[in-house]
Design a protein with these regions (language model features):
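Residues lining hydrophobic/aromatic ligand-binding pockets adjacent to catalytic sites
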Residues: 1-196
Length: 196
C-alpha cells in the first residue's frame, strides 16, 4: 500500500514556455505508470509567488488542469490573490484539491486556509523561517524545525479537518538538515498519542 505524490515539473509551474503542452504530455505519460498501478496519491502543482492572479495565468491554469485531467491534482498557490471564492469554486468544480500550507506569516503570502475543494487534504509544511523566505536560497528558506507545541497544534488541526476528507496527505518541505524527517516522525507520534 505504498503511494507516491508527484510534483509537477517546473516546466509546468516555474518555467512555463510555449511548449508547455508537450511537457504536460510527457509528464502525464510518466505519471500514468503510477496511476495505472493505483500507486499515485496526488500530483502537486506548486505555483510560485510570481504566478500572480491574472487573466493569462487563470487561462493557463485551467488549460493545465484540463491537460492533466483524470489525475488526483493538488494546487498550491504562493500568492495571496488566488485566495478568493471564485477560485475555490472552480477548483471544487474540477475536483482539484487546494493545498493547505504552513509557512511564515509574511505580506503577500496566502493565509493558512482550510478551504476544502475536494475529498482530499494535502497539507504541506514549509517551516516558518521568515528571515530567509524572500532572500534565502532553496535550502535556507526551508531551514526550520517545528517545536513540539507547533506540531501538537498541527496534529489537532489535522484531526479536525480529516473528518471532512477521505484522504489526508502530509508533506514536510523543511528539508534542511533532515528536519523534515524528524518533524514528520514527531507529528506521527502526536497523531498516535491523540488517537487521531
Amino acid at each position: 500500500d505504498f503511494l507516491f505524490c508527484l510534483k509537477a515539473h517546473r516546466s509546468l509551474s516555474h518555467e512555463i514556455g510555449k511548449d508547455w503542452g508537450e511537457s504536460a504530455e510527457r509528464f502525464s505519460s510518466a505519471a500514468q505508470v503510477l496511476s495505472g498501478k493505483r500507486q499515485l496519491a496526488a500530483i502537486l502543482i506548486q505555483l510560485p509567488f510570481r504566478f500572480s492572479y491574472t487573466a493569462e495565468n487563470r487561462v493557463y491554469l485551467g488549460d493545465l488542469i484540463s491537460a492533466l485531467d483524470g489525475f488526483p491534482l493538488v494546487v498550491e498557490f504562493r500568492n495571496e490573490f488566488w485566495y478568493q471564492q471564485r477560485v475555490f469554486d472552480e477548483l471544487a468544480k474540477r475536483k482539484v484539491c487546494l493545498a493547505i500550507i504552513d509557512r511564515p506569516e509574511l505580506p503577500g503570502l496566502p493565509p493558512e486556509s482550510q478551504v476544502l475543494t475536494s475529498d482530499r487534504v494535502y497539507y504541506r509544511l514549509h517551516g516558518r523561517n521568515s528571515t530567509q523566505w524572500w532572500n534565502g536560497d532553496a535550502t535556507s528558506r526551508y531551514d526550520y524545525e517545528y517545536s513540539p507545541e507547533e506540531l501538537k497544534d498541527r496534529a489537532r488541526m489535522l484531526a479536525a479537518i480529516s473528518r471532512k476528507a477521505k484522504q489526508v496527505l502530509v508533506a514536510f518541505n523543511n528539508h534542511a538538515d533532515a528536519k523534515a524527517v524528524k518533524n514528520a516522525r514527531s507529528l506521527e507520534g502526536y497523531i498516535r498519542e491523540f488517537q487521531l
